[in-house]
Amino acid sequence: MEKYEREAKEAGRETWYLSWALDSTTQERAKGKTVEVGRAYFETAARRYTVLDAPGHKTYVPSMISGAAQADVAILVISARKGEFETGFEKGGQTREHIMLVKTAGVTKVVVVINKMDDPTVGWEEERFKEIKDKLTPFIKSAGFNTKTDVIWIPISAYTGVNVKDRATKAQVSWLTGPSLLETLDTIPLIDRKINGPVIMPISEKYKDLGTMVVGKLESGRVKKGDSLVMMPNKVNVEVLAIYSESEEEINYAFGGDNVRLRIKGIEDEDVSPGFVLASAARPVHSVKRFEAQLAILDHKNIICAGYSAVMHVHTLAEEVQLSALLHYFDKKTGRKSRKPPQFAKRGQKIIAQIEASDLVCIERFADYPQLGRFTLRDEGKTVAIGKVTRLLAIDENVITEGVSNIALGNTASSTAE
C-alpha cells in the first residue's frame, strides 16, 4: 500500500491510493473509475476470499454483470455523503440497476456497506444510516431478496478503516453495535458446491503465458493436473497442464466454487473468448443458436416485437440475440400463459419468446442449471429484460431435453429470474 500511496501522490491523486489496489490500469487511475473487473485475494483466520471489484459507472455495466456472474455474495457499496447516495439511487442512477442485476446473476446474499460515514456531511450520524437503509430496503425487497434473511447492513469508513476489520469502538461510534464487515463475511453460510458433478467453468479471461491461460470460476466438478476436458462451443479437446489459485500459487486440485487460472494445451489463446465454457468431455454443456425463454420486460420505451435485437448477458458471455418469435404472454391476474402468440410485449409484461443468437452460445435450461440458464437483455445502455432459459432447440427443430444437471450434481441453487 505504501507503493500505491507514493504513486498516487506523484500523480496528484493522493486520496485515491486505496482504490489503486484494484484499479490497476492507467485509464482507471486517471479517471478515478473502475472500468474492468479487478481481482484481488485475501484471507482471514476463518476463510479465503476472492474480491471481484465491479465497475459502478453506467458505461461499464457489462463488466459489472460479468463480475456478478462469478460471485457468491454481493457487497453493495453505498456512499453516505449527502447528495452522492441520492444521485446513485434516483431514476437513471446505477444503484437500482445493480441490485436487480446481482439478483438476476444468481447472487442470494447481499451485504449493503454504507461507506463514507466519516464524511463531514454525515459525521457518523445514525439518522443518515437509517435514512439510506429505509430508502433502499423496499427496492431490494422488490428485486426478490428477503430483507430479513438475505440482506445485511454495515456502516463503515473505508478511508479510516473504522468497522472494516475491527469493530468500531464506542469512542468512535457511540450508537453502533454488532460485528465489523470482515466479521460479518466470515459468518455468512457457505454455498453447497456440486463438486461431484461434471466440470463447468465459464471463461472470464484468457491470455498467453507459457501456453494458453484461462481464468474463471469453477461452477461445478473438480479439476486436477492432467485432466482431459473440452472447450465449448468449439468442441476442442484440451489438457490441464497446471492449476493456479488466486494467490498465484500452483495447486494440485480445484473444486466447485474456486476461482482459478488454468494452463491448458490443445487450443491457442486466440481461439478462446470470454463466455466459452470448459467442460467434462463425457458431459459437455450444450451449445445452441436457438432457445426458448421466459422474459420479464423491465424498462423499454417502445413495444417489443418479433425481430427485436439486444445483447444477452449470460454467465461470462455477452452475445447479440434476436427475438425471432413471441410465443405466449402471461396474464397478470391468473398467471396463465396465453394460447395465442402476442403481437408485441411492453414494460411490465412477462412473455415466452423464441430467441436466436448470432453464433453458438453455451447455455442450459434454468431448471437444470440456473447459473447457465439465467440472463439479462440490454439495449442502448439499459437492462430491458431478465430471463430464464426454458427450452434448448436443436438445428433440426427438436427440443433438447437432457441437460448437464440430469446426472447427480448435489444441491442446485434455487432462485428465479423473475
Predicted regions and their residues:
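Conserved catalytic-core segments of large NTP-driven translation/proteostasis enzymes
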Residues: 130-302
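G-domain G4 guanine-recognition motif of GTPases
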Residues: 4, 79-81, 108-130, 152-171, ...
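Conserved, well-folded catalytic cores of nucleic-acid-processing
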Residues: 7-11, 25-28, 67, 71, ...
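C-terminal effector modules of nucleic-acid-centric enzymes and ribosome-associated factors
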Residues: 124-126, 267-418
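P-loop NTPase switch module centered on the Walker A-proximal segment
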Residues: 1-62, 71-84
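Residue-level signature of catalytic and energy-coupling elements of molecular machines
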Residues: 1-4, 32, 53, 64, ...
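Conserved Switch II/interswitch segment of TRAFAC-class P-loop GTPases
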Residues: 47-50, 54-60, 69-130
